[in-house]
């Protein structure tokens, strides 16, 4: 598991537990030191790399899963609303990401147009997850895999409710609104 945009390490701490090898990459040295300390306190063995996502990606070995939560602000601190304006630019990195990982998890701003993001990333997007809390959209997560697909699974979650649209063939789709169990 490789997190190319480590940040505070919260997503990394949660998601990496299912993997034997865990690599956290972050360009900010202060965040790396904080994450290293927190991982030690949590008893989470991880390799912490202080560096740019783009450079690490070029030299890294194959990974089962690569996670990215690109920065959503430009060099002036203004919010960005297009995936191509995020840092790192995932659209530019996509060919190398697909070469280096079986699955790419991409966490994006709820302000982004998910349909445009899917179009921009091409037909490797297999799943779209829209996560809400109390009817307020919090995150957009795209699951990208090698091999193209024409049928994207769309899942919307809000507290204990889950709505899923799974297309099959042409224009038909199956829809269901279910309460999550447990």
Give residue spans per PLM region.
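Mobile, glycine- and charge-enriched loop segments
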Residues: 1, 60-68, 72
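Conserved class I S-adenosyl-L-methionine
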Residues: 1-7
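S-adenosyl-L-methionine
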Residues: 25-65
